[in-house]
């Protein structure tokens, strides 16, 4: 922790989680003055242990990847997803993105967030950010007292001794997590997704069996739909030999379940409810946990729980401020997208602030760049997750009111001709198009495996199984595969991944997509935004 808190910061970052620490790292490396105010003292507990492969290239850009790789976190070779009990699970293989299934070479990891997050925060300090823990921001002050359209200029915060102080700043980055001080207290623009109002409960187990131990899939997380269609379970191995096991169900089902227990004169504890729901994931409970022990099972706090409501906002930036991480938006954790979205938003916030300071573009254009990048990334993952829930609940999810039309256009522009069957697509997004997009995206989790991919490639030719082949329509896949159902599954999975897997490239992918004539400039020392030539 830094020793002396200055009265003014060029850039104030509120929150030291992955979003805040990553943004602070990049800006400090560029030579800007950065102060981070973190409400808690690290290390601190946090859920969200499963990472996407994109996290590694993001961390490589900030220089933190070797610290994470050498820490000993559990390598994540892929992920298994089981939607239906009478069908095999699907498996996403990350091996092609890594140089080996060891922590140092892994494409992704399962992490303990208390350790992962602290490494990133200390890295920000090493690069020059001034970090102050146990300093909680309480209020923001705006120029001309204009909250709705004004510019935040200072923050009031509490110190460890309880003293209230203030700090002024030129730029504000709100990385305050779900509390989201800008969005909830001042902009008042947080909008919850009515379809994804879920609750989560979880605990940690010892002595659990693993998914395919001794194989190339060893340590892969396993995700399983509950048999009653109310949600899903996660099973995530960690490097301390424990396993994180959680249940996500929709709030309505959870409330009804507890009300029924109350009417029957039964008090349903968090632990009893968790164990009862776990039985609805027979592979996780019956196969992996059959001889396992719940950590602290005699403690009333052995089961943790949290609301799992997905939300977004109508904007994530403004005059000299940016919103990132959970302070900006949050989406259901099925796709393990939390840290990915945090780092992506942190990157674009840092780039837009750098561009504004260096005057390579106006503050307005810079803010809008960040705003649209966050919205596009959120929309992509939203449609993937909604496609998953459409399968889990076995029903159409009418989400037209949940999706911003402009964000959909930007996020899925390459899919619209494929989905609608013509290059001359309409400009207005329809409910039918959203349903087809969700159906397209759900094939990301088709029940295939690497051996099936290899066999289909041998039959149809490896070029058809290449991710570089243009996205195909359903009719094109039908013509190619005929009655070969295995090939149909493989091609549909590959097809769906083309719209999502480019994001695994981290900063390079973010830099490749232009917004209103601007792209990221990833050159260290000149980091920011530049015009597309």
Swiss-Prot record:
Pfam families: Trp_halogenase (PF04820). Keywords: FAD, Flavoprotein, Monooxygenase, Oxidoreductase. Gene3D superfamilies: FAD/NAD(P)-binding domain. Disulfide bonds: none annotated. FAD binds at residues 16, 19, 49, 339. GO terms for molecular function: flavin-dependent halogenase activity; monooxygenase activity. Transmembrane segments: none annotated. It catalyses: melleolide F + FADH2 + chloride + O2 = 6'-chloromelleolide F + FAD + 2 H2O + H(+); melleolide F + bromide + FADH2 + O2 = 6'-bromomelleolide F + FAD + 2 H2O. Melleolide sesquiterpene aryl esters are cytotoxic secondary products with anti-cancer potential. Armillaridin shows therapeutic and radiosensitizing effects on human esophageal cancer cells. Armillaridin induces autophagy-associated cell death in human chronic myelogenous leukemia as well as of hepatocellular carcinoma cells. Armillaridin can also inhibit the differentiation and activation of human macrophages and thus might have potential to be developed as a biological response modifier for inflammatory diseases. Coiled coil: none annotated. It is an enzyme of class 1 (oxidoreductase). One of its GO terms (biological process) is secondary metabolite biosynthetic process. It comes from the Eukaryota. Its EC number is 1.14.19.-. Chloride binds at residues 337-338. PANTHER family: FAD-BINDING DOMAIN-CONTAINING PROTEIN (PTHR43747:SF5), FAD-BINDING PROTEIN (PTHR43747). Flavin-dependent halogenase involved in the biosynthesis of melleolides, a range of antifungal and phytotoxic polyketide derivatives composed of an orsellinic acid (OA) moiety esterified to various sesquiterpene alcohols. The halogenase catalyzes the transfer of a single chlorine atom to the melleolide backbone, resulting in a 6'-chloromelleolide product. The enzyme acts on free substrate and does not depend on carrier-protein-dependent acceptor molecules. Can also catalyze the transfer of a single bromine atom to the melleolide backbone in vitro. Belongs to the flavin-dependent halogenase family. Armillaria species are both devastating forest pathogens and some of the largest and oldest terrestrial organisms on Earth. They forage for hosts and achieve immense colony sizes via rhizomorphs, root-like multicellular structures of clonal dispersal. This is Flavin-dependent halogenase armH4. It comes from Armillaria mellea (Honey mushroom).
């Amino acid at each position: 922790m830094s020793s002396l808190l200055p009265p003014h910061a060029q850039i104030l970052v509120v929150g030291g989680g992955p979003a805040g620490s990553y943004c602070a790292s990049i800006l400090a490396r560029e030579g800007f003055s950065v102060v981070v105010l973190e409400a808690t003292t690290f290390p601190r507990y946090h859920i969200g242990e499963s990472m996407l492969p994109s996290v590694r290239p993001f961390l490589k850009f900030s220089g933190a990847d070797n610290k994470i790789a050498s820490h000993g976190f559990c390598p994540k070779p892929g992920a298994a997803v089981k939607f239906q009990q009478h069908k095999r699970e699907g498996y996403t293989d990350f091996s092609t993105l890594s140089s080996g299934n060891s922590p140092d070479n892994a494409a992704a990891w399962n992490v303990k967030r208390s350790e992962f997050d602290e490494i990133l925060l200390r890295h920000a300090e090493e690069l020059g950010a001034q970090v102050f823990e146990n300093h909680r921001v309480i209020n923001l002050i705006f120029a001309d007292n204009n909250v709705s359209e004004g510019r935040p200029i200072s923050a009031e915060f509490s110190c460890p001794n309880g003293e209230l102080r203030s700090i002024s700043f030129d730029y504000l980055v709100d990385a305050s997590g779900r509390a989201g001080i800008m969005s909830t207290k001042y902009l008042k623009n947080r909008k919850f997704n009515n379809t994804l109002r879920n609750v989560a409960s979880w605990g940690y187990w010892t002595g659990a069996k693993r998914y395919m131990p001794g194989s190339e899939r060893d340590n892969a997380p396993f995700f399983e739909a509950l048999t009653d269609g109310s949600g899903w379970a996660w099973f995530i191995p960690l490097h301390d030999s424990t396993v994180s096991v959680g249940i996500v169900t929709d709030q309505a089902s959870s409330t009804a379940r507890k009300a029924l227990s109350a009417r029957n004169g039964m008090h349903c504890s968090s632990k009893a409810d968790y164990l009862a729901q776990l039985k609805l994931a027979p592979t996780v409970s019956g196969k992996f946990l059959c001889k396992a022990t719940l950590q602290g099972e005699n403690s009333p706090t052995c089961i943790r729980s949290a609301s799992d409501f997905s939300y977004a906002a109508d904007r994530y930036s403004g005059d000299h401020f940016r919103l990132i991480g959970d302070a900006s938006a949050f989406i259901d954790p099925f796709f393990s997208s939390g840290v990915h979205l945090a780092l992506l938003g942190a990157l674009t916030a840092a780039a837009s602030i750098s561009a504004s300071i260096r005057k390579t573009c106006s503050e307005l254009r810079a803010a809008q760049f960040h705003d649209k990048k966050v919205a596009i990334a959120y929309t992509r993952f939203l449609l993937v997750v909604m496609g998953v829930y459409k399968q889990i609940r076995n029903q159409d999810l009418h989400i037209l009111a949940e999706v911003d039309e402009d964000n959909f256009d930007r996020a899925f522009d390459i899919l619209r001709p494929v989905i609608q069957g013509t290059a001359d697509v309409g400009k207005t997004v329809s409910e039918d198009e959203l349903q087809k997009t969700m159906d397209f995206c759900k094939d990301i989790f088709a029940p295939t495996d690497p051996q099936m991919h290899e066999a289909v490639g041998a039959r149809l030719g490896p070029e058809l199984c290449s991710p570089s082949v243009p996205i195909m329509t359903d009719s094109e896949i039908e013509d190619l595969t005929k009655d070969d159902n295995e090939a149909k599954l493989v091609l549909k999975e590959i097809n769906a991944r083309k719209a999502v897997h480019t994001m695994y490239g981290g900063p390079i992918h973010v830099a490749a997509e232009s917004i209103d004539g601007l792209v990221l400039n990833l050159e260290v020392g000149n980091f920011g935004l530049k015009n597309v030539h």
